[in-house]
């Protein structure tokens, strides 16, 4: 049976589904790579909130902004304290033109310009200590300023080092080595109609305590007539009989049973591509080497779900007795040999569609009556 490769722009390859190309540009809450598409807007004092949580703000910065900020911070502290040293020397009379008075002791030796004060600040803060410029006992204010500079800049260096280590140690990059299939399929698993996705760990280091869950996001109208734009419903996934903590050493297929309790129970081959929903899938796991908790995310919209297909097997046994995961087959699907579940009786489908339309009309009428009663 021929396999079909599903890539980032290969949705039109599936020709058996009517309307496969419709609504392809619908908005997504989450991108395929797991990044949020929600824009936070019109929040009073949002910059103040970011400053109050400065640690998280700096860690979340991109590297180019972080490096620019830290470089600018060091240069500004050198210059600021250099200006203060220059002011102290000016007030003390160390910058008078002409020959220095024989009995005059300057606050800082060899500092007779703003450039010299800047270099003294830089040498003191970085503990270079060339030995040419040095502070004397003549000015207690200069001594106090030197102590304050070293204490303040030490705290800045501790903060910078901590944020660098925290950003490097974050398990974000580890989560990027967890691969989700680009599409999902609806097929039969153990005689039950299931929605199936495929997940793989791209590294040899194991992920322990894996938990995969899903959230169905769709518009919902309550009995009171309130319209919830992104109602969340839990979608439970299983893998074999170890649904609590699967052993993700090889690419695995996770399935969700489309039974009476499923929020996707109304899906049919005819209405799948016309539905308005987004299925967000989250995999939480603990990294074996660091014990850090990481999360990998993706989402599926109706155009990325294929009815009557199944994934091509990825794992095989080599001649020397080793298990091999062929990732060239990871994004390939093929038609399911059992076509009974998508070749259902047309009268039954028409009856189900009639009931759904009647329920929708009744809900709209209830909403209209409620709105009129509130006038």
Curated annotation (Swiss-Prot):
Residues 114-130 dip into the membrane without crossing it. It catalyses: K(+)(in) = K(+)(out). The record marks 157 as: Role in the control of polyamine-mediated channel gating and in the blocking by intracellular magnesium. It comes from the Eukaryota. Residues 1-60, 166-375 are cytoplasmic. Can form heteromultimeric channels with Kir5.1/KCNJ16. Interacts with PATJ. This is ATP-sensitive inward rectifier potassium channel 15. It comes from Homo sapiens.
């Amino acid at each position: 049976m021929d396999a079909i490769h599903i890539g980032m722009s290969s949705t039109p390859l599936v020709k058996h589904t009517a309307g496969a190309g419709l609504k392809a540009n619908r908005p997504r809450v989450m991108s395929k790579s797991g990044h949020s598409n929600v824009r936070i807007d019109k929040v009073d004092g949002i910059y103040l909130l970011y400053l109050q949580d400065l640690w998280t703000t700096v860690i979340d910065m991109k590297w180019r902004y972080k490096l620019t900020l830290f470089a600018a911070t060091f240069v500004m502290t050198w210059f600021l304290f250099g200006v203060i040293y220059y002011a102290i020397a000016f007030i003390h009379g160390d910058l008078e033109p002409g020959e220095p008075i024989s009995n005059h002791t300057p606050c800082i030796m060899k500092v007779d310009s703003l450039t010299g004060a800047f270099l003294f600040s830089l040498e003191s803060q970085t503990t270079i200590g060339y030995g040419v410029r040095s502070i004397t006992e003549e000015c207690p204010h200069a001594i106090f300023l030197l102590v304050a500079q070293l204490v303040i800049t030490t705290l800045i260096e501790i903060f910078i080092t901590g944020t660098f280590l925290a950003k490097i140690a974050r398990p974000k990059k580890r989560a990027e080595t967890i691969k989700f299939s680009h599409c999902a399929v609806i097929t039969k698993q153990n005689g039950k109609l299931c929605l199936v996705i495929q997940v793989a760990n791209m590294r040899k280091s194991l992920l322990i305590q894996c938990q995969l869950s899903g959230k169905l996001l769709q518009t919902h109208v309550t009995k009171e007539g309130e319209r919830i734009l992104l109602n969340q419903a839990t979608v439970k996934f299983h893998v074999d009989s170890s649904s609590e903590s699967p052993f993700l050493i090889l690419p695995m297929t996770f399935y969700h049973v489309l039974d009476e309790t499923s929020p996707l129970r109304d899906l049919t081959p005819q209405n799948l591509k016309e539905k308005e929903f987004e299925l967000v899938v989250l995999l939480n796991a603990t990294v074996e080497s660091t014990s850090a908790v990481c999360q990998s995310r993706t989402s599926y919209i109706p155009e990325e779900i294929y009815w009557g297909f199944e994934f091509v097997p990825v794992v095989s046994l080599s001649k020397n007795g080793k298990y091999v995961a062929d990732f060239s087959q990871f994004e390939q699907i093929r038609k399911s040999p059992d076509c009974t579940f998508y070749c259902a009786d047309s009268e039954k489908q028409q009856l189900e569609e009639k009931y759904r339309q009647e329920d929708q009309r009744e809900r709209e009428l209830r909403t209209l009556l409620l709105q009129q009663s509130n006038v």
